[in-house]
Amino acid sequence: QYIINIAEHFKSHNINDDSYWHEREFSNIYDELITIKGIGPWTAEMFGMFYLLERDIFPLQDLGILKAINQLYCVDGVPLHIDQVIAISDRWKPYRTVASWYLWRSIDNEAILY
């Protein structure tokens, strides 16, 4: 059903090429995507990061990101509060997508082969 919802959205908005996405601000794209049943914040953020190549996205709901940032910044075993995670990620603006990639890599022991 979610695939059908996405297809219907594309059809009703006459989305048939990349210019629909690449000529708009990501905040507007994000707001539009999360209105489609089956697409939530995480999916919209991944779309922005990996398809649109947005450089300043920090997926706060990503479990890998939260695990990595807690491994690096957690004190005395107490998980960071979301406000602390936001404050840390704010230091990485406007390149939080790159920071996200490094955080993911920090918890993944497998080499990436290009």
Stretches with model-predicted labels:
Residues 11-15, 52-57, 106-114:
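Short helix-capping/linker segments at secondary-structure and domain boundaries
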Residues 16-17, 71-76:
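Substrate-binding clefts and substrate-entry loops adjacent to catalytic sites
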Residues 1-35:
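Alpha-helical ds-nucleic-acid-binding substructure associated with the helix-hairpin-helix region
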Residues 1-8, 41-48, 82-86, 100-103:
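Short, well-structured alpha-helical segments
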Residues 25-71:
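Catalytic DNA-binding helix-loop module of base-excision-repair DNA glycosylases/AP lyases
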Residues 6-10, 36, 72, 92, ...:
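Alpha-helix boundary/capping residues
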Residues 21, 25, 35, 39, ...:
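Short amphipathic alpha-helical interaction segments
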Residues 28, 74-114:
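A basic, often C-terminal nucleic-acid-binding module that engages the phosphate backbone, implemented
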